Amino acid sequence: DLNSMENTIDDQTSAILIEGIQGEGGVTPATPEYLLGLRKLCDEKNILLMFDSVQCGHFRSGRFQSYQRILEDIENTFQPDAISMAKSLGGGIPIGAFWVKEKHSSLLSAGMHGTTYGGNPLSCSIALTILDV
């Protein structure tokens, strides 16, 4: 609920991280109103809205990302600030990725964000093929 979320934000809050569709909690999608409300709240508070799309990204919801599925019937320009991705990105081959809007890219510099899957040529080749499909 947006009121509870707003009441938990303080001057130490830098981001909100959510799953657009909770996979482990019973495949429960967020409502369009909630996602749009979170975007507005994050913009007002100058904090990042981040999505965990490990479970429900890459067409598992019928759209490239879960928020696109949830908001498909609403005219909007919604976009999260960052998205974590894995699992279906590699079609069963281990890979993970972290996407961030260009305006926030300066928050990460070389060496600040590492990965145990980073740079694997097989995984990267498969992920590029999946993204091309």
Report each predicted region and the residues it spans.
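Conserved N-terminal phosphate-binding loop of PLP-dependent enzymes in the Aspartate aminotransferase
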Residues: 1-133
